């Protein structure tokens, strides 16, 4: 979406339910006078793992007809180096206390303190502890998946993958993957996985396996995987 920070010109923001806070780059923070207050620890996909970042406050954030004041934010300072693109801005509606509906087919985004219930083909119980998760199964084993509108694929953690038994053995295909904490040198593609979310099935599905130990440690529970655009864009 396009958003204005402190009344400045519009910039692109990723709507990111996989982020604990709204995030701005060092460049935008300096340009729009978002002052850092203190440092905190953040964690994401990538070999950096736990990462020290600044916390600041956006006086006003405008997205379409929505205007929010006094928005806590993470400032990506120091910035990551060695990744293909610069770190982008992202807006976390859940951290702002908002409900959100993303209609991928109609390309429509709805925010609100309360959003009326609508008929649904499938409902998944949602849990929120810093991030929002749903329960799923990986080869019939229970796992918690982060709902990440800012992510691209369906992935599972390396710890979850290590508990799966394969007969015969399945070849692992190395991948080049980076996230909010840099490159993940151990990422690989694992074919032949059976995923289930209530009645939503992904049989014999290739998943990306990521090192999620740092996010799990910071959150205080084992993150089993992440569901991103590949999953969510069907709805």
Protein language model annotation of sequence segments:
Residues 1-235:
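Pepsin/retropepsin-fold aspartyl endopeptidases
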